[in-house]
């Protein structure tokens, strides 16, 4: 719950390189007039980025414009105006730039609908319209842009169903249609996107099942459908997709058990986000074979049994969330986690862990910033070795059976902001050193007083 993530990872840096295109000095009146109309449609240009778009210079030298010069054509091939807070609807005259291959209009304030004449841009390869306030439906006529390799419409206000026609884009490598109000099902035709590497449909209102053929996409590296209403099970074909590095299906209505061999069939896995679904069963021991795993979220489910003691074999693990399950009672796996020297966040809250907190807990990574044990049945005194975790920002140990005094070693927590120890059997008065924790803004100690610092 504390570490719940809906990861929308910035894979653009991993999988996409913006091209460098040679600028020449051609002339083409059709393109010039289209650019003039585009400028006229802009009502807000706070950085004056379009001030060069005038007759004082040849339009091939206008800011954000790239030309190519060939034997037959001297045409605009790229429009790059990303991140300048430009405002207005996107001019339909952009469709007259028929040699456009690249459109970078992300991170602006464009609104209205995506021009329906975009299919005239049949040479289009990359289009970034993410981080605007565009509305309406995703144009099905985008399927006519058969050379499209990248379509990124994330973070807009689009609605309606995802066009099944997009499944015909055989060259498409990245498709991001996340953070909208898109409805309906994931089109089965997406199983035909034979070149797709990144498929992100997160944070919508999609329903139905995951199409089985998604698991047959041989190049798929990143798959995200988090925060929808997808139900059913995850296709076995997806579990066997060895190219996958990131799987994010958290906050849906999926139900299943994890395959025993998941760590063997997904050896390149780096991120596994399964939180807030209806999965059950044991946590597979084979996960330790996914040696590149960095983030593992199995929270808010019905996982049961013991936590594998070999998770310490994951050298790059820095985020582990096992909260809100039926795991327990042994905490022996904590000793193994001391090998995870990059561990930054650990959430074991709301399970059935019992017994005393092992002394090796103080040998967890010194990079640890968040540690949560609350709502378990852990007893005994708080080990003084916890004081070794000097970079803690959040520590939750509430609603357990801890006894004794608050260790004075907690004085070392000079970065601590949130400290929950309520609902235990702690004794004594509020330690005076608490006043020296200058970053602390929430201290909860109901057994010996409640204070907000």
Q: What are the roles of these predicted feature ranges?
A:
Residues 1-452:
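Plant-biased, solvent-exposed loop and capping regions
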């Amino acid at each position: 719950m504390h570490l719940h993530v809906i990861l929308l990872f910035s894979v653009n840096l991993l999988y996409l390189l913006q091209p460098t295109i040679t600028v020449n000095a051609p002339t083409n009146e059709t393109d010039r007039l289209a650019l003039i109309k585009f400028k006229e449609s802009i009502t807000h240009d706070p950085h004056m980025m379009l001030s060069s778009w005038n007759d004082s210079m040849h339009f091939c030298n206008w800011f954000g414009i790239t030309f190519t010069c060939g034997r037959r054509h001297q045409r605009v091939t790229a429009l790059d105006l990303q991140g300048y807070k430009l405002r207005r609807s996107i001019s339909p005259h952009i469709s007259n730039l028929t040699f456009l291959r690249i459109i970078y209009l992300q991170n602006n304030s464009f609104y209205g609908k995506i021009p329906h004449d975009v299919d005239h841009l049949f040479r289009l390869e990359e289009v970034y319209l993410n981080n605007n306030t565009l509305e309406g439906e995703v144009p099905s006529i985008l399927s006519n842009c058969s050379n499209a390799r990248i379509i990124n419409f994330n973070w807009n206000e689009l609605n309606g169903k995802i066009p099944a026609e997009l499944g015909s884009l055989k060259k498409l490598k990245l498709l991001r249609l996340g953070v909208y109000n898109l409805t309906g099902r994931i089109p089965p035709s997406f199983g035909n996107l034979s070149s797709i590497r990144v498929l992100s449909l997160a944070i919508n209102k999609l329903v139905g099942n995951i199409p089985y053929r998604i698991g047959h996409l041989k190049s798929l590296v990143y798959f995200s459908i988090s925060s929808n209403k997808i139900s059913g099970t995850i296709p076995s074909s997806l579990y066997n997709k060895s190219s996958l590095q990131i799987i994010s299906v958290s906050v849906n209505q999926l139900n299943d058990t994890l395959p025993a061999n998941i760590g063997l069939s997904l050896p390149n896995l780096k991120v596994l986000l399964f939180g807030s679904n209806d999965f059950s069963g044991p946590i597979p021991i084979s996960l330790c074979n996914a040696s590149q795993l960095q983030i593992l979220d199995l929270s808010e489910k019905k996982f049961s049994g013991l936590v594998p003691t070999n998770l310490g074999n994951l050298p790059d693990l820095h985020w582990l969330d096992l909260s809100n399950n039926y795991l327990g009672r042994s905490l022996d796996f904590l000793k193994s986690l001391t090998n995870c020297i990059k561990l930054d966040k650990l959430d074991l809250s709301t399970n059935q862990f019992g017994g005393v907190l092992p002394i090796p807990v103080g040998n967890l990574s010194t990079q640890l910033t968040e540690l949560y044990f609350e709502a378990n049945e852990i007893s005994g005194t708080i080990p003084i070795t916890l004081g070794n975790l000097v970079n803690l920002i959040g520590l939750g140990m509430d609603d357990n059976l801890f006894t004794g005094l608050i260790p004075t070693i907690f004085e070392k927590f000079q970065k601590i902001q949130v400290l929950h120890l309520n609902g235990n059997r702690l004794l004594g008065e509020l330690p005076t050193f608490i006043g020296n924790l200058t970053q602390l803004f929430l201290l909860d100690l109901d057994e010996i007083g409640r204070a907000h610092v």
